[in-house]
Amino acid sequence: MTQYRITFEGPVILGAGLAGLTAALSATTGAAKTALVLSPTPLASGCSSAWAQGGMAAALSGDDSPALHAADTIAAGAGLCDPQAVDLLTREGPQAVRDLAALGAPFDRKADDGFVLSLEAAHSAARVARVGGDGAGAAIMAAVIAAVRATPGIEVRENARARRLLQDANGRVVGVLADVDGALVEIRSTAVILATGGVGGLYAVTTTPAQVRGEGLGLAALAGAMIADPEFVQFHPTAIDIGRDPAPLATEALRGEGAILRNADGKAFMADYHPAKELAPRDVVARALHAERAAGRGAFLDATAAVGAHFPHEFPAVFEACMSAGIDPRRQMIPVTPAVHYHMGGVATDLDGRASLPGLYAAGECASTGVQGANRLASNSLLEAAVFGARAGRAAAAEGATGGPPVSLEPLPDLPDAALQGLRKAMSRDAGVIRDADGLTRLLGEIETLEAGHGQGPILVAARLIVTAALAREESRGGHCRIDFPATDPVGVRTFVTLDGREPGLRYAAE
């Protein structure tokens, strides 16, 4: 039973990463505009944006262009990118980076004040704007948070977790039921923007905050929203394998600087898997590491020659993580493992963040604009959050309809921690880098058992969506690898999913 009700004039934004806060800033541009941000954790903690190391990819040099950036994005996306969305991202990307710099994001600069740009895997040009080598996410978020706190129209509620999307009798989203400081609160609004991040916390090994576990995806699906491409989960190939949860990340930029992947025998093995070697797309590199580890040869990142003595100031986050485990990356190889890093799927939206339900928007990793395809290009995630977060904020702020009273005020079922930890292990085992029908079928049965015991809540629904779509896609493409269906179909076809009762109903549409 709700303890009190709030009626809010502007959009309510669930999540406080780069997409959510950019949406809030965009929604409050202009007189008398307001936005309410709900964050389950204090700002600057608990969101993947603040953990991002590589930077933001954009055509910021005279040797580059949005068209080249778009071509690289589409190539990495393995046939499933929406060209219109990619074109928009790459055209608006340079200004998005400049806007963040204007807010105070301290991007690395050259003597002429131009951006220092790095090369990363599957990019045809150096186009990644960085901060302090590997500190882009934290520095960008600090600047954005300062701007949010300085904007009178933005209200932030920390320790606030969404428990249900509120809908009227016509299905319109009219607000959110949230646990705010232990009280169940009915928040009515003209629009809700989901900016809840990805699904890393559904897996045992992830580079994202463990509390980012697909709840926004599940909330939207349980409300009846269309979900796109949930089977496509990106595994970053070089999480630092030191037994920490979440696993620290060894940024892609290290390989861009010339770091080499070796096995325990010291052999540089990437030439056996792809002509681009260490700079192959992430899905290729992740599968190569998985194969080396499965064969008992181990996998290590050797940056002793490429970075060496420069580690402490060029890649301080990686250096600190390694040293905390007794590994000196200036002289020793770094043990690495694939880890869940990003979800290409999400709530299906148009180019302004509109979901299939009136009143509902989504931006950032929890959305699927069609930009990322079956495999995200390195350093496109912060860019997508900034570009599409701003667009969603503007569109949601323009919503005029309020809808009727909500038909249900009951919180959706939660999942106890012990059950969640078991789910994480099962997801890594059967819906990980390598998948097959036997494992996915077994995993789906385990999810059904958990649903029978704990109810069909957002976390389990998010897991079910991933597994059901992975079982249905009988091919290998991008981040989805089926060892029982290793070939890639000639025509790329996206997945669209809606929940119909307990079972996801899948349909496909060629892009």
Swiss-Prot record:
Chief localisation class: cytoplasm
Single Gene Ontology BP annotation: 'de novo' NAD biosynthetic process from L-aspartate
Compartment list: Cytoplasm
Enzyme class, spelled out: oxidoreductase
Pathway annotation: Cofactor biosynthesis; NAD(+) biosynthesis; iminoaspartate from L-aspartate (oxidase route): step 1/1
Reactions performed catalytically: L-aspartate + O2 = iminosuccinate + H2O2
Pfam family, one: FAD_binding_2
Active site per UniProt: 282
Database matches in InterPro entries: FAD-dep_OxRdtase_2_FAD-bd, FAD/NAD-bd_sf, Fum_R/Succ_DH_flav-like_C_sf, Fum_Rdtase/Succ_DH_flav-like_C, NadB, Succ_DH/fumarate_Rdtase_cat_sf
EC number: 1.4.3.16
Binding site for FAD: 16-19, 48-55, 365, 381-382
A Gene Ontology term for the protein's cellular component: cytoplasm
Keywords on record: Cytoplasm, FAD, Flavoprotein, Nucleotide-binding, Oxidoreductase, Pyridine nucleotide biosynthesis
Record has Flavoprotein as a keyword: yes
Note describing how the cofactor binds: Binds 1 FAD per subunit.
Cofactor: FAD
Positions marked as site (Important in orienting the L-aspartate substrate): 120
UniProt key word Transmembrane: no
GO MF terms, alphabetically ordered: L-aspartate oxidase activity; nucleotide binding
Family: Belongs to the FAD-dependent oxidoreductase 2 family. NadB subfamily.
Chain's role: Catalyzes the oxidation of L-aspartate to iminoaspartate, the first step in the de novo biosynthesis of NAD(+).
Entries under NCBIfam families matching the protein: PRK07512.1 (NF005701)
Protein name: L-aspartate oxidase
Lineage: Bacteria, Pseudomonadati, Pseudomonadota, Alphaproteobacteria, Caulobacterales
Name of the gene: nadB
